UniProtKB/Swiss-Prot annotation:
GO terms for biological process: pyridoxine biosynthetic process. This is Pyridoxine/pyridoxamine 5'-phosphate oxidase. GO terms for molecular function: FMN binding; pyridoxamine phosphate oxidase activity. Catalyzes the oxidation of either pyridoxine 5'-phosphate (PNP) or pyridoxamine 5'-phosphate (PMP) into pyridoxal 5'-phosphate (PLP). Homodimer. The lineage of its organism: Bacteria, Pseudomonadati, Pseudomonadota, Gammaproteobacteria, Pasteurellales. It comes from Mannheimia succiniciproducens (strain KCTC 0769BP / MBEL55E). FMN binds at residues 61-66, 76-77, 83, 105, 140-141, 184, 194. Binds 1 FMN per subunit.
Length: 211
């Protein structure tokens, strides 16, 4: 058995004060995201999305954050996937971004909605050709007989669409509309900085939490 008890890091890079935080948590998220990109953090847009299905059981997976706007956080996926089925019956999610190199994480909770078909079309058209083919070939989360069947299907779709690939109707974007956003900065002695924003009567309330 692997001994994990003594695997730990001491956090000491930066501090996070209320004065440093923007009044708008989405702008604060953009600021931290930009700093992660500038620091060349590995996969700075990778975020864990947790959902809960009708059976009450949670599931989570890492997806790529593709946009932060005034409403929330946007990601794209197959609507028939496990997360898509979860969101169809329980349209809420918890999201986490972790930037180990900066000793930071951001936690988001909120309602999830599909974005407009037009916005999904626009993003889909920007994807590499092979990724667009893959969106048609993959019945995400479905059991398949083997890898060859997937590759054969992709080849058939590529032959059918050698140039332009339309967006599959079952593929598109979601937006997580935050009700809570927490910013975490690792600090010495595990006395971390935690600044939480929560939505109250349409206004953001900012508060410090005990680590």
């Amino acid at each position: 058995m692997i001994d994990l008890h003594n695997i730990r890091n001491e956090y000491s890079q930066q501090a996070l004060s209320e004065k440093q935080c923007d009044d708008d948590p989405l702008k604060q998220l953009e600021k931290w995201l930009n700093e992660a990109i500038q620091a060349k953090v590995n996969e700075p847009t990778a975020m864990n999305v947790a959902t809960v299905g009708e059976n009450g059981k949670p599931s989570s997976r890492v997806v790529l954050l593709k946009e932060v706007n005034e409403r929330g956080l946007v990601f794209f996926t197959n609507y028939h996937s496990h997360k898509g089925r979860d969101l169809a019956v329980n349209p809420f999610a918890a999201v986490n971004l972790f930037w180990a190199e900066l000793q930071r994480q951001v936690r988001v909770e909120g309602r999830v909605e599909r974005i407009s078909p037009q916005a999904s079309d626009e993003y889909f058209a920007s994807r590499p050709y092979t990724s667009r083919i893959g969106a048609w070939a993959s019945e995400q989360s479905a059991v398949i007989s083997g890898k060859n069947s997937l590759l054969t299907k992709a080849a058939l779709i590529a032959a059918k669409h050698p140039l332009q690939v339309p967006r599959p109707p079952h593929w598109g974007g979601y937006i997580v509309i935050p009700e809570l956003i927490e910013f975490w900065q690792g600090r010495p002695s595990r006395l971390h900085d935690r600044i939480r924003y929560r939505l109250e009567k349409g206004e953001w309330v900012r508060e410090r939490l005990s680590p």
